[in-house]
Every structure is written in structure tokens, then in C-alpha cells.
Regions:
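Interfacial loop at the N-terminal end of multi-pass membrane proteins
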Residues: 3-63, 106-116
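Transmembrane helix-loop junctions in multipass membrane proteins, especially transporters and channels
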Residues: 31, 35, 73-77, 99-103, ...
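Short alpha-helical packing/oligomerization segments
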Residues: 74-97
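Juxtamembrane boundary at the C-terminal end of a transmembrane helix
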Residues: 136-140
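Interfacial loop-to-transmembrane junctions
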Residues: 100-127
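Residue-level recognition of transmembrane alpha-helices
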Residues: 12, 83, 87, 122-125
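Alpha-helical transmembrane segments
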Residues: 20-27, 90-98
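Core segments of transmembrane alpha-helices
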Residues: 57-71, 125-134
């Protein structure tokens, strides 16, 4: 277990940078393109997108959560707690808002109002993961 915590802490800046870049690409490029995908192929395309993006997002999110929780416990300074709150906030928005939107799109197909909600609410995740990266830079 200590090896995992050490690994997460040593690579925190890289992981946080990866999430920072990924969330901005999703916000500015991927989600807006949802509006342009033909309705006849949207469900298939969206399912493929969710499966593939998950290969990148899930490991990064898990590493962030482990690192932020352990740093809050072992280091216990204001920046560690701020980063942990940012990571936790991003997880909450992901689970409570973004994931249900994606489930609806996967089930019902392209719905402009759902895509617009996804884009609008994703700004909060974009802010949170940007904050996490900035804090990580300050800690480095």
C-alpha cells in the first residue's frame, strides 16, 4: 500500500496535468461536437466514446483521489486540503450530474437539451480540475 501512495504522490503533478488537459479538450472540443453527430449513429458513437474516454479518465481520477486523500491525511496542510476538496468536488459533479447525462444520451440518443446541460455543468468540473492542477503546481 505504501508503494501505491508513494507512486501517486510522486506522479501527482503529471496526473493532475493530464486531467487538466483532458477536461479542457472535452469542454472545448469533444462535447460541442456532440451537436454535429448524425442522430442515426449517435447512440453507437456515444457508447464508443464513453468506453474509450473511460480508459483514460478512470485511472487518472482514481490516482487523484488516492493521492489527494493520502496527502490530506499524511501532509495535512491547507494546499493538500484545497486539492482534496477540488478532487472530491469533481468526483461529485461527475457522479451526480455528468454520468446521468451520459447515461441518458446512451439510452435515448442525441438530445440537444441534455448535451447543452452537459456542456454547461461541465464548466464546474473544468474549474475544479484546473484548480487541482494549479494547487499541484504550487505544491511542486
Amino acid at each position: 500500500m505504501s508503494y501505491l501512495l508513494e507512486f501517486c504522490h510522486e506522479h501527482a503533478l503529471s496526473v493532475d496535468f493530464a486531467m487538466f488537459v483532458l477536461i479542457w479538450v472535452v469542454q472545448l472540443i469533444v462535447y460541442p461536437v456532440f451537436h454535429k453527430i448524425d442522430d442515426r449513429v449517435f447512440v453507437s458513437w456515444h457508447g464508443s466514446y464513453c468506453n474509450r474516454i473511460g480508459l483514460f479518465v478512470l485511472p487518472l481520477m482514481l490516482l487523484q483521489l488516492i493521492e489527494a486523500a493520502s496527502a490530506s491525511f499524511f501532509i495535512d496542510d491547507m494546499l493538500a486540503w484545497l486539492k482534496a476538496m477540488g478532487v472530491l468536488g469533481a468526483w461529485i459533479v461527475t457522479l451526480v450530474v455528468s454520468a446521468p447525462c451520459h447515461r441518458k444520451l446512451s439510452k435515448d440518443g442525441m438530445q440537444t437539451q441534455v448535451v447543452n446541460r452537459l456542456i454547461r455543468t461541465n464548466w464546474l468540473r473544468t474549474f475544479l480540475w484546473t484548480l487541482v492542477f494549479v494547487v499541484s503546481c504550487l505544491q511542486y
